[in-house]
Design a protein with these regions (language model features):
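Canonical Rossmann dinucleotide-binding motif of NAD(H)/NADP(H)-dependent dehydrogenases/reductases
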Residues: 3-33
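Active-site loop of short-chain dehydrogenase/reductase
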Residues: 6, 53, 80-81, 134-148, ...
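The beta1-alpha1 cofactor-binding region of Rossmann-like NAD(H)/NADP(H)-dependent oxidoreductases
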Residues: 58-71, 109
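Substrate-binding pocket helix/loop in short-chain dehydrogenase/reductase
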Residues: 95-104, 108-113
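Catalytic loop of short-chain dehydrogenase/reductase
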Residues: 109, 141-170, 175-176, 180-184, ...
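A short, exposed helix-loop element centered on a Lys and neighboring polar residues
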Residues: 127-128, 176
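C-terminal helical subdomain
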Residues: 184-185, 191-192, 208-259
Length: 259
């Protein structure tokens, strides 16, 4: 695969979809930097066992100074930054059988602010401080976790997920704007979610189960490997004509989604 020997930064790589992606990119021969506030020993060990180089960098992406230092550390260690995957986020488990987040009338301002600071501002910080290195190379790929629209108001699973969806739709708009700014520097910036690609069986299962999903919830969810597959590896090789778009992968090919 074209990501072999590429330097790939995965924020939020200690767990969830980020951890799955770390293993997939390691298997494809990439050089990994895992940026997370959570302990990274487990994923670093998994990546090393796959024969890949890995650099864990403890970082709170809400803190711009920490992010700036993290990008400097990765560049100093590897000499370049080829791919940034902005995976780190506070995720609502509204489809995992966990307690719902509060609806707006019951939500503390501090809760709302923390989700926006992590999901949206964290993506901004990481993108901002990776771009100068990519501009220097005149090449790079940035993959943001965003979505092009909000959930159907009739979907009961969307209740309590308001601020999460606000953050992800905002990331979609952010992607379009930054992609336009960086096109002349040959930096491809796309937005995509873990699902929305290959058709899934209509068996009543909702959400995506990862290594950290409680066993009692896994039967009602789809396993991350069956849903995500290699879509982020494909996105890390996306052509410039897709930059700025919401994309997914179907039948092993990247597809532009309608806004």
């Amino acid at each position: 695969m074209a990501v072999k020997d590429k330097v790939v930064i995965i924020t939020g790589g200690a767990m969830g979809i980020g951890r799955y992606n770390a293993r997939r990119f390691a298997s494809a021969g990439a050089k990994l930097a895992i940026v997370d506030i959570a302990p990274m020993e487990a994923v670093a060990s998994e990546v090393a066992e796959l024969g890949a180089q890995v650099l864990p960098v403890h970082t709170d992406i809400r803190d711009e100074d920490q992010v700036r230092a993290a990008m400097e550390q990765v560049h100093k260690h590897y000499g370049r930054i080829d791919v940034l995957i902005n995976d780190a986020a506070i995720v609502t488990h509204f489809m995992a059988g966990s307690p719902r987040w509060p609806v707006i009338r019951d939500m503390e301002s501090s809760f709302f602010e923390n989700v926006i600071r992590t999901n949206l501002m964290g993506t901004f910080h990481c993108t901002k401080h990776a771009i100068p290195y990519m501009e220097e190379q005149h090449a790079g790929h940035i993959i943001n976790f965003g979505q092009g629209n909000v959930r159907n108001e009739r979907d009961p699973d969307s209740i309590g997920a308001c601020v999460y969806h606000i953050s992800k739709v905002s990331i979609r708009a952010f992607t379009k704007e930054v992609a336009a700014e960086e096109r002349e520097h040959n930096i491809c910036i796309v937005s995509m979610g873990p699902g929305g690609g290959d058709a899934q069986p209509n068996d009543g299962r909702r959400g995506i189960a990862t290594d950290e999903t409680p066993a009692e919830n896994r039967e009602r969810m789809r396993w991350v490997g069956d849903v995500v597959k290699d879509r982020y590896i494909l996105a890390a090789e996306a052509p410039m004509e897709l930059s700025g778009n919401q994309i997914t992968a179907r039948d092993g090919k990247l597809v532009k989604l309608d806004d």
